[in-house]
Amino acid sequence: AFFLCRHYIEDQPELVKRMKKEGHIVGNHTSHHVCMPETDSRKVREEITDNANYMKEATGYEMDRFFRPPKGEYSERTLQITKDIGYTTVFWSMAYLDYDVNNQPGSDYVINHFEKYIHPGAIPLIHNISKSNAEALDTVLTNLEKEGYTFHSLSDLKKG
């Protein structure tokens, strides 16, 4: 699954279309990557609905009804708002600092991190702008398959 902010959709509309054409989930990460608990309720709704509306306008595709709050910051109020407007909020169970394109951890770090922290039911947070992730992904997936892991979409998990 990919969780996108508006700027990514603006910068990469063809790539977003490709994500959808290939069957990937494209979820909501707000228009402007705001801190949800510090944002008033009206603006929380706008950040989510405006981002979804923009994706539809820019790509012709609907955004999937999954939401990942920026930085994982939430409150009971913001969780309720996202639920009320029809989104399933998704968090992660393992992550590392991969979002700074000028300070990448390296592919060996990524591979070792997965070996150390992977667990059944894991939802890794992997930023798609990371060169280290791109370089390590094939090895990580191959290693996990050898260990008996299988991969499922968020839609599969939601079905239970």
Name what the model sees in each region.
Residues A1, P120-G160:
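Terminal accessory/targeting
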Residues A1-L4, I25-N28, R65-P69, T88-W92, ...:
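Structural recognition of the beta-strand scaffold that forms the well-ordered cores
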Residues C5-H7, S31, P70-G72, M94-L97, ...:
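Active-site beta-loop-alpha junctions enriched in small/polar residues
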Residues F3, E10, E38-R45, G72-E73, ...:
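Soluble non-cytosolic domains of exported or imported proteins
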Residues E73, T78-Y117, Y149-G160:
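His/Asp/Glu-enriched short active-site or ligand-binding loop at hydrolase and phosphoryl-transfer sites
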Residues T30, P69-P70, D138, T142:
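Proline-centered helix-kink/hinge sites
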Residues E14-K17, K21, R42-T49, N53, ...:
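Solvent-exposed, polar/charged alpha-helical surfaces in well-ordered, non-transmembrane soluble domains
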Residues A1-T39, K43-D64, N143, D156-G160:
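Active-site beta->alpha N-cap acidic-glycine motif
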